[in-house]
Amino acid sequence: MQGKEILKQLSPYKQGKQIKDIQKDYQLDYIVKLASNENPYGYSKQVNEALSTENFDFHIYPDGYTSDLRTDLTQKLNIDESEIIFGSGSEEIIQLLCRSYIIPGSNVVMATPTFPQYKHYSLIENAEIKEIPTDKEGYHQLDKMLGSIDDHTAIVWLCTPNNPTGAAFSKEELITFLDNCPKEVLVVLDEAYYEYLHSDKDLDALQLRFTYSNVIVLRTFSKAYGLAGLRIGYGIANSTIIETLDKVRGPFNTNSVAQKAASYALKDQEFIQHTNQENYKNLTEFQHFLQRLGWGYYDSEANFLLVKTPISGMDVYEYLLRFGFIVRPGELLGIPKTVRVTIGKEQDMKELQKVLEQFDHELG
């Protein structure tokens, strides 16, 4: 018995080092995980307070329609209930999109480097992959991506801000792309880091569905909202796309706790504002530090920074582990001589700067 032939070419996702692993391997008490772009401030206190008063019937299947969260989110975003789908993280919706729209002989277009699961799930459906390198600053080259579309293109994957570079294209660039993109090609706009965008970079993406029937926008509660451990995200598009995805979605794909937690988190926008303010402050300070150190970096509109390292990113990663800092080496992201650093709390970032300064001094 064998699986699909393509699976012989793929590998399971390899997660980064976990805190418990570092504690065991290095005998450290002070450990800071800056590898997975999680929210260092956790999540809204209102979530814990509200959940403590809830009575969960764990022997009962969850609400397959995600009714309460659907109502809360559609009211906040001013969309119709038929225009939204929920998933176990927005990643599940990526998987649903591949299952729904990729047919034999299809190809998909994406940037490189970008979020790897676009490619992974597309390959599982036997799609041809067309990868267009980002420019030297880490931005999508939308004109070249447009030029690579042909009669067999099923999906174009756009990630903004892009993971791992942090770059975000402008609304004008996106509109030009969409105006020239064939209407039968699905355009997936992944805004996992949407809440971190500054207003001048906001694409007003939810309004695009009125003009472009081939666009779906993905967002998540895993990043700024801090609910990564509960796995819940959503997609917004016209009702025709949503109905198609619902046909391949599992009937109970988001759990009861995640649904409730997301609803309560959504109500606490002060927490999101605080997260944004602290992230911007600490990101800016870290950029200034790197400038003083003489290290380069990619501009970022998210809660992470892709840092250009003077030697192998893997070597920098290994060095930082010895001092309790977990980052993501660029060699695992397809960008050698870089590390991706999640922006942490102020004191943790100051400690990281001390270690990097020491490392740079040792390099001579």
Curated annotation (Swiss-Prot):
Keywords, ordered alphabetically? Amino-acid biosynthesis, Aminotransferase, Histidine biosynthesis, Pyridoxal phosphate, Transferase
> A single GO BP annotation from the record?
L-histidine biosynthetic process
Known cofactor(s): pyridoxal 5'-phosphate
How this chain assembles, per its entry, is: Homodimer.
Q: Which family does it belong to?
A: Belongs to the class-II pyridoxal-phosphate-dependent aminotransferase family. Histidinol-phosphate aminotransferase subfamily.
In terms of NCBIfam families, this protein maps to:
hisC
Query: What is the name listed in the Swiss-Prot or TrEMBL entry for this protein?
Result: Histidinol-phosphate aminotransferase 2
What is the organism field in this record?
A: Oceanobacillus iheyensis (strain DSM 14371 / CIP 107618 / JCM 11309 / KCTC 3954 / HTE831)
What gene codes for this chain? hisC2
